[in-house]
Amino acid sequence: MIKAVRGTRDLLPPDTELWNRVEATVRDVFQRYNFHEIRTPIFEDTALFARGVGEETDIVSKEMFTWEDKARAQSEKSQQLTLRPENTAGVVRAYIEHQMAKSGGLQKLYYIGPQFRRERPQKGRYRQFFQIGAEVIGPPPSGSESPARDAEVIEMLATLLEEVGLTGWTLYLNSVGDANCRPAYNEALRQALASVKDKMCGDCQRRAETNPLRVLDCKVPEDQPIIETLPKIGDYLDDACKAHFAAVRAMLDKVGVPYTVNPRMVRGLDYYTRTTFEFTHGELGAQSAVLGGGRYDGLSEALDGPKAPGIGFAIGEDRLVMALQAAKPAEPMTIDAYVAPLGAGTNAEALGICRKLRRQGLRVELGDESFRLKKSFEAAERAGAKYIVICGENEVANNEFSVKELATGKQESVARAELAFYIRNHGARKTGGENIEPDEQ
């Protein structure tokens, strides 16, 4: 038997019901904040991630699925392609390629889709995983550099998590400075690491020389006591970065979004500048991050684009759903009605009833005329139906149908024109003042 590849999985009902509800809620929130959907390819030129994400990051150095384009392998300019491990670089690439900066305003873009990393599969972490993300990008006159953009994005995330039903989260904030003040911090890190790096893991020993900031990303437990002794970036921020971070915090205080400043948090991507943030949840264990993001004021220029500061985030949808399921197990799937054809020639009539009910927004399952009454009831219960509509030869002839509420056993005869009203309103009858919907006539 062929099975799903290690690190991937199938999403099945009823779990997909929760995934769909999450995505519908997320789309609604994005629309209220004036974000618009963007869809980018799931694979890109490898150079995009090497230049955009950073060659010293774990993502680029260890975790990417990369191959040579066979269609060009014989040419002088063979191309390396990579399944996208994250989507910010791809969105910024699209922003540059399609000259979206020419609009002069902010581009507020969101995406929902799969990403791919060659990670060790574990609880909540897969080699194919799903992200919900958004980016706010624009040339300087658009206000894209404003700390208000950072605060708005973070406030939107607090709203989003509330509306999908996740409570008990913790928000961590930090500022990682910018190109003006970070070099001094990198040098301070390099000097501090010189005497202790030999006691750290191999990756940290290498990064201490090539990219000291990435040492703070280390997840090796034995290295954490050393990392706690290293200089804090907050002590090296220049006045502009300090003012920006203070403004972000003040706005979050004003709108009532709680946070904790974590001076060690740098996030695992080289493009971040100034504000970085993570939302975590205790149900996810040691690696508790549900989402993370930050500002990336130089990414567009690093990819040969115009100056276009931005801020964005990515939600680990797998991890968000896992946290929601831990708090509240998935509910059984339900439908509004099961229409049971009974007797020869009643299938077409039952299908017609299903069509009318569905056109009124009801969730309906069509039975089979080969089923006896008992089997139809069993099928209706398995389907999670609230009502079963009996469509037999007598019912068809009289244009009235037996409708039974499975939870209570209440059964009544209902005219064809009133079926949708009766089911939608939990057994209520029309009093004569209500109009019959067009599809019920």
Curated annotation (Swiss-Prot):
GO cellular component, one term: cytoplasm
Subcellular compartments: Cytoplasm
Keywords noted in UniProt: Aminoacyl-tRNA synthetase, ATP-binding, Cytoplasm, Ligase, Nucleotide-binding, Protein biosynthesis
Catalyzed reaction equations: tRNA(His) + L-histidine + ATP = L-histidyl-tRNA(His) + AMP + diphosphate + H(+)
GO MF, any single term: histidine-tRNA ligase activity
EC number(s) stated in the UniProt entry for this protein: 6.1.1.21
Domain of life: Bacteria
Coarse class of the protein's main subcellular location: cytoplasm
InterPro entries: aa-tRNA-synth_II, aa-tRNA-synth_II/BPL/LPL, Anticodon-bd, Anticodon-bd_dom_sf, His-tRNA-ligase, HisRS-like_core, HisRS/HisZ, HisRS_anticodon
GO BP field: histidyl-tRNA aminoacylation
Family, per entry: Belongs to the class-II aminoacyl-tRNA synthetase family.
Assembly, per entry: Homodimer.
Name of the protein in question: Histidine--tRNA ligase
